[in-house]
Structures are given as structure tokens and as C-alpha cells.
């Protein structure tokens, strides 16, 4: 069996990835499938950190546009990510995989506080670490949280798992002529305003030379093939 190319990864999942076709909430079958794939990565010797968005439950920015205070909306979004993190923890533990949920907000009755050194130690012991509550601050996306945590834990690769195959010059659903990028620099993505991650997340990755792979989470086994060395999705690097 081919040895994994990456020893430690940070996998960013959108909250929408968990809801399937339901429109909201968590699809139990999709949750189980994603947990199974993550467990297989661990069995292959990869240390896995996770950041899961909360868009399947609530989006703070959207609530703000509806009249809710932005900070309050963002705090609601952070709590939504904790709900998703606990669901993933349960799904992984049902497979026998040890997991720790670490929150940027203090919720000691349900998860640990985020402490970088402790998180790294959990990873070294083969535990999946799910980083919840974003950065713990309003106005920052979970994409920014994923970039930050990937840098902090010294991940070899940040993977953004999406519903599309990678980075395009435009929405491929709306524009069949959209160009697919197999590789590009962060500066190119920023200059062209490509819809990859928000500016803060991209600049963090660029400045700290964190490679980012954007790929389709719904192609079963794709993450494992990537870890084994296949060229899947789009790769973003510091120029």
C-alpha cells in the first residue's frame, strides 16, 4: 500500500456538506460516510484535524442582513459549528476512532478549550481533532479559522472540501465555459477575485506558505487518493 504523501492535514468541511439534499440540518448517512473516510485516513497513518462550518444550521452574516446584530449572528454561527463538531465526534467514535472537540469558545461541559499544544499532542496520539467555534471572534469565517488552525498545528496541507471539483474562473454551473485551474498561486486567486476562500484566509495561507487543495468532497475516496499522491482538485501555493 502506498505511503501517504502528507503526515498531517487540516480538512475544512462546509456545514452544507453535512445536510445533503435536506435543505438544512444533518444527513445521518452523509455524516457516516464522511466519518468513515476520515477514519480510513487515520488508519493510513494520517493525522487529521477538522474544521466544519455551520451553514447547515445558521449563518451569522445572513442573519445580520436580516436585521440581527452581526456579532450576535456570528456567535450563533460559532455555536452551530459546535453542534456539527459534536455530531462528527459521535460518528467517528461509533467507528472506534478517538476524537477530541476543541472549541475557541469556552463550553467545558461538552468539549475542551482550544489549546494549541494540547491539540498537537492529540494528533500525535492518533486522535482526530475537531476545531469548533471558528476563531472565537466575530467577523472571521470558518475558512479563516481553518487556515489559522492549519498553520498553528503545522499541517502539511489544508484541504477545502466543496461541492465542485476545484477552482474555476467562474461558477461552472452558471457558465459551462468556465476555466478549471489545476494549480495557481494565492496572488493569482486574489488578483482574479476567484471564489476560493475569503481574503483573510487566502492571505494567511500565502504568507505562511500553507498549501491549499480545493476538491469535491462528494467523490467517494477522493481524499484518500489525494493523500496517496494523486493530483486531484486544484492546488494553491505561495508564488
UniProtKB/Swiss-Prot annotation:
UMP binds at residues 54, 74, 135-142. It catalyses: UMP + ATP = UDP + ADP. Pfam families: AA_kinase. It is found in: Cytoplasm. Its main location: cytoplasm. Its EC number is 2.7.4.22. The keyword tRNA-binding does not apply. Keywords: Allosteric enzyme, ATP-binding, Cytoplasm, Kinase, Nucleotide-binding, Pyrimidine biosynthesis, Transferase. Pathway: Pyrimidine metabolism; CTP biosynthesis via de novo pathway; UDP from UMP (UMPK route): step 1/1. GO terms for biological process: 'de novo' CTP biosynthetic process; UDP biosynthetic process. Gene3D superfamilies: Acetylglutamate kinase-like. One of its GO terms (molecular function) is UMP kinase activity. Allosterically activated by GTP. Inhibited by UTP. It is an enzyme of class 2 (transferase). One of its GO terms (cellular component) is cytosol. Residues 20-25 are annotated as: Involved in allosteric activation by GTP. InterPro entries: AceGlu_kinase-like_sf, Asp/Glu/Uridylate_kinase, Uridylate_kinase, Uridylate_kinase_bac. ATP binds at residues 12-15, 55, 59, 162, 168, 171. Homohexamer. NCBIfam families: pyrH_bact. Belongs to the UMP kinase family. Catalyzes the reversible phosphorylation of UMP to UDP. This is Uridylate kinase.
Amino acid at each position: 500500500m502506498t505511503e501517504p504523501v502528507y503526515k498531517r492535514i487540516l480538512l475544512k468541511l462546509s456545514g452544507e456538506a453535512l445536510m445533503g439534499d435536506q435543505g438544512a440540518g444533518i444527513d445521518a448517512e452523509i455524516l457516516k460516510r464522511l466519518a468513515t473516510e476520515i477514519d480510513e485516513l487515520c488508519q493510513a497513518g494520517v493525522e487529521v484535524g477538522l474544521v466544519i462550518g455551520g451553514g447547515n444550521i445558521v449563518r451569522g452574516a445572513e442573519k445580520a442582513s436580516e436585521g440581527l446584530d452581526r456579532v450576535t449572528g456570528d456567535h450563533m454561527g460559532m455555536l452551530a459549528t459546535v453542534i456539527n463538531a459534536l455530531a462528527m465526534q459521535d460518528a467517528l467514535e461509533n467507528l472506534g476512532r478517538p476524537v477530541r472537540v476543541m472549541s475557541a469558545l469556552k463550553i467545558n461541559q461538552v468539549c475542551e478549550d482550544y489549546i494549541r499544544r494540547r491539540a498537537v499532542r492529540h494528533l500525535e496520539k492518533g486522535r482526530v481533532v475537531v476545531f469548533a467555534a471558528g476563531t472565537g471572534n466575530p467577523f472571521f469565517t470558518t475558512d479563516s479559522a481553518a487556515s489559522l488552525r492549519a498553520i498553528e498545528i503545522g499541517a502539511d496541507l489544508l484541504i477545502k472540501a466543496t461541492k465542485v471539483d476545484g477552482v474555476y474562473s467562474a461558477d461552472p454551473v452558471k457558465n459551462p465555459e468556465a476555466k478549471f485551474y489545476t494549480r495557481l498561486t494565492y496572488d493569482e486567486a486574489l488578483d482574479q477575485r476567484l471564489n476560493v476562500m475569503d481574503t483573510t484566509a487566502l492571505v494567511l495561507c500565502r504568507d505562511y506558505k500553507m498549501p491549499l487543495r480545493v476538491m469535491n468532497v462528494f467523490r467517494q475516496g477522493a481524499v484518500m487518493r489525494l493523500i496517496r499522491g494523486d493530483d486531484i482538485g486544484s492546488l494553491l501555493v505561495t508564488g
